[in-house]
Amino acid sequence: MFRNIVDGFKGLVDVAGANYSPYSVQNVKIEDYKSMSKRLEDGHLILYKKHGCYDCVVVGTPVKMWSLFRLTSDGEAVAQFKLISSKLNILIARSSSLLLENNLQKATDVIREHHSWTPIHIAAYLGLYEFFSQPDILSKINDKTTTTEVTPLMVAITGSQLQCTEQLLKNGASLYMQDNSGETAYHYAVKHHPKCIPILSQFDRDSIKDFFNGKGQTALFVACEKGLSEAVEQLLYAGAEPNVTACDLLPVHIALKTNNMSNIELICEKFPDQLFAKEKKYGGTLAHWARNRESVEKLCKLGCDVNIMSDTGHTPLHIMLKKNRGECIMELLVYGADTRLGDTDGNTPLHLAVEKDDIELVRLFIIFGADVNTQNRKNETPRHLAAVSKKKNRDVILYMLHISGGRRCRKNAHGCLKGCVMEGNYNGTVDDTMQHVMTLDREAILDDMFSSFEDFDQDVDTSNFLRKHRVLCLDGGGIRGLLLIQMLMAIEDAAGIPIKDCFDWISGTSTGGLLALGIAMGKPLPYMKGLYVRLKDEVFKGSRPYPAEFFETMLKKELGETKVMTDIKEPKVIVTAVLADRHPSQLHLFRSYHPTLQTYQDENQPKDRLVPSPPDEQLIWLAARSSGAAPTYFNQAKAFVDGGMIANNPTLDTLTEIHQYNCGLKLRNEGHLVKPIGCVVSLGTGRIPVTSVQSVNVFRPEGILDVKRLVNGFTALVNMMVDQATLSEGPPVDRSRAWCSMLNIPFCRLSPRISEDFPLDCHDDKSIIQMMWETQCYIVANKAKIDKVGKLLRSIYDVKNV
């Protein structure tokens, strides 16, 4: 009775095990099976029937036995037994290492999952490399399965068996074999174990690594499609060719499509021509296929051509417009995309922006140099398209084109309306911001009537200027240095010569100092404009104060890591900074020349106080870093902080320096080298709106309600002190103007009115475009003034270069 109960309980346990873990390999005791009946037996395997289930065991040695599965169905148990025994017996006979619990588990799992695999395939997958040293096995080393047609080599790679893979290749495994999808061992290595690729390449004599699968894809293409950087790197090192494909796309294109920039970088570093490779369908390059700002930035840094044409006649800028990828448009422009290039219909990006009725894009393209009078193949200008448009923004866009120089259509033009017809006088509608800026600029023109700028109106004898200095002074202002660049580009256009050749002295503070150095080193203004826009993303990272290493890396790259100030020969450059390790603080001038007057050091000064390096030892990038070390934005550079703390408008300091330079020449009996100042051009980074301040009172509070008034008053007082310390408009301009007027020196001050106080570290693209557009409006309003400056500078240049 008791024995029956125990047997019944064991039966229940066996059935439960058969239901919940039927295929887990378990170490069992031989004595537990002595009283059981055998259902089947084949070699090392026996199928027992016990307590309502069927138990398949493998006998390894007289004392070791493992249960492979436990099933309740007779038919299923018999089928599994025959499937496993037909393969496992062969494996056990040739590889004793299989007789371990883990190995048996792997082997039985593989047999159940891959019915068509032969013992050779299973041995390859499990890494039983000793299995392949026997002659009868070697004759079947390239056998394919009946279903997927995979070879033992492919299976070994799938199982990540490096040693077995190498053993198979040494014993004659063929790399030419392909499965029913056309995939080679390389394709399998890409998907399953890239570390096998170097082993495969050692036995590859015919560039099988570049074979296509059934889809026309090489192993490199598949690696790029799946974003497998290790596989891409291994294939490139093994000699894979990125130009080989039977698809429309090359590996680099599919890598970009999957947004894997690391793979693109790997390919393009080894094969730079892939930056310009064209896909077959449209003939587009990587620049055409970019989908986000980060992709464009990386491609541009790698050296792609942002103006390359596709086979359909489109630049990357045209494609980004059609795909509405605004961030990509901005990034392309920053890296030099040409807004004047047309597509097959002759439409420039400005034409397309007008057709899209997009005010922001119209502004953007005008700011970045679009020709507002270019005609497409239908002889239509952007102004004509705006005039005949029926969309809601047509009137504002028409006015934007008008003030940017957009001319009316010719008399023989067809389909014109009042906004573009030759005899018309309608020029569109001014939006509120433009109206405000243009009105304020008219006030600025009246303001200049009281300056010595009137001298530019006279017929100047330019020969008198041959022995006079032409001086350019650039204010500080962070990202608002873009406004300086726009005005300089306008002057450059008016003069018709590079801005570097227009001046003998260039000075700058902070952002103006960086710009002065860039100009003196021959960097084009459009390049500097792109650099400044990139600066907001590459330098202003995180929160204030920003890490200086990004700023310093950029400066070293752009200005040179080892170049010193005296490497700049012409024009002479002055960059301002403040020595903050002493009280009172002291203005310091970084010069590209040696001063003619000796500066004497106080013998009693502390030994640890910084002594600035002479010009022939002063690194250029460090001078720019020191001048731009704005408090709360960046940590100080050694003892230096931003020059704007004393000379945010460096005009008077520059004039003083030139006067002292001439005095020094006279003291050295070099009076023949003395040149007086001939003209001064001073550029500012914008005049912000005047706002109300309630109070600057700081007092002892008598009650809790006074605390808020105290805080507000203290904040206003601090702001006022900072504003006055960094003042660049108003009194500094008036003093400079008066200084020049008294000496009969032509003086020109340009500084646009802007609609808001844009922060020095502004990140927002829309805000940046807005202030650049307002500067464009200012340039248009002051065109006559700028033209006179350009005319004078060009006249002097022509006389000097006769």
What are these regions (language model features)?
Residues 112, 144-146, 178, 211-212, ...:
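Ankyrin-repeat boundary/linker signal
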Residues 116, 148-149, 182, 216, ...:
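Start-of-repeat signature of ankyrin repeats
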Residues 187, 287-288:
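Extended, amphipathic alpha-helical scaffolds
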